[in-house]
């Protein structure tokens, strides 16, 4: 495993292009585009203010930079660096901006969610969509880019509108049986739309493309409900994470629950492999001691080593006592993601923040648990194979695969605190992001990594 040099970064804004050829990063008001293979700077663009959001067009030819405080969006072209577009929403303000799937239209959401403005880069025409709902996930596109679903709120009721992306004509408009709609998401095959309600009302609804209600699912009443939702890439399963610390798996045939995964603090099953991160301070030999002691700032002292150990059951996981009299308590399933082959599901229970649970979806059972020394900040699956990358806000990267686990120290002066990460679409590298910097991590082939994992006490 190799690492690149460290580059400057602002606001964790660093994204690979969809075609995998470029890497865009932001340093305050500057946008830097690099070649992924050489990391040489290809283009350097200067925006009018500090960049708060970036997004590549689907064809990787354009990149959007949003400056919400100024109500501005600037669009840059990689093929024609001298060309650029500026969109000023003026007094209407700006709270969100995204590309349409064709990469030639930009959707801007104005302040207070009064409307969505659709700007065409080709014809310079402008269209308006009224009544967008202010919710966590209110816009979703089908994978083939043909349709857009939009959550709306009008006359104190929730609605969903489905638009044809080629001409922005309204295809379907229907009300949803929700108290306060929180999110919508298309299945990867584009046939079913999942709609879920506020956490105060446990309800998830499944609609067809023509607006027919296919099914409604509710696990319980009178308690905090849904916290997270994820489709499997195969569209066969819908995972619903709840505030009660369980994940419920719905199937695509009957839309009924086929199983539920609990997240207890104690693991007693000897068939479950529990990997515990262990830290060991390096032993300083007599030759390593210096007299007098080194001055502050004279160089970093040897850092502690980290590795995984297989814990013997029963295992008690570290829990966090939630503050229940405040909003958004740290309980329930806050993170969940399917592997690209739909074989595995990774989850995190927010009141057991140091643990990542990996579930075998084929056998509908718990496969492994990874307990870190620090709370898990983020995890993401390799796009090409069942390999999970994890970061905890420290200077280490953690990898899990069915072959086992490994912990890798990120090199560099001082501590490189990995706050987030994103895979390259090839699965051969990933970007590691800290508060003010980023670097690239290059991985060997799966055979080499698998061998390394087994040497570190892996389990198959």
From Swiss-Prot:
Alphabetized SMART domains for the sequence: WD40 (SM00320)
Top-level lineage group? Eukaryota
Keyword Ubl conjugation: yes or no?
Answer: no
Q: What is its main location?
A: cytoplasm
Identify one Gene Ontology CC term for this UniProt entry: ciliary basal body
Q: Which residues are listed as membrane-spanning? A: none
Modified sites of kind Phosphoserine: 281
One Pfam family matching this protein: WD40
| Annotated WD repeat ranges | 46-86, 89-129, 176-210, 221-260, 328-369, 371-410
Name the GO terms of the biological process aspect.
cell projection organization; mitotic spindle assembly; positive regulation of non-motile cilium assembly
Q: In which tissues is it expressed?
A: Ubiquitous. Predominant expression in heart, brain, liver, thymus, prostate, and testis, and barely detectable expression in lung.
State where the protein is found: Cytoplasm; Cytoplasm, Cytoskeleton, Microtubule organizing center, Centrosome; Cytoplasm, Cytoskeleton, Microtubule organizing center, Centrosome, Centriole; Cytoplasm, Cytoskeleton, Microtubule organizing center, Centrosome, Centriolar satellite
Keyword entries, A-Z: Cilium biogenesis/degradation, Cytoplasm, Cytoskeleton, Phosphoprotein, Repeat, WD repeat
SUPFAM superfamilies on file: Tricorn protease domain 2
Q: What does this protein do?
A: The SSX2IP:WRAP73 complex is proposed to act as regulator of spindle anchoring at the mitotic centrosome. Required for the centrosomal localization of SSX2IP and normal mitotic bipolar spindle morphology. Required for the targeting of centriole satellite proteins to centrosomes such as of PCM1, SSX2IP, CEP290 and PIBF1/CEP90. Required for ciliogenesis and involved in the removal of the CEP97:CCP110 complex from the mother centriole.
Quaternary arrangement and interactors, per the entry? Answer: Interacts with SSX2IP.
Q: Which PANTHER family match?
A: WD REPEAT PROTEIN 8-RELATED (PTHR16220), WD REPEAT-CONTAINING PROTEIN WRAP73 (PTHR16220:SF0)
Tell me the protein's name.
Answer: WD repeat-containing protein WRAP73
The gene name on file is WRAP73
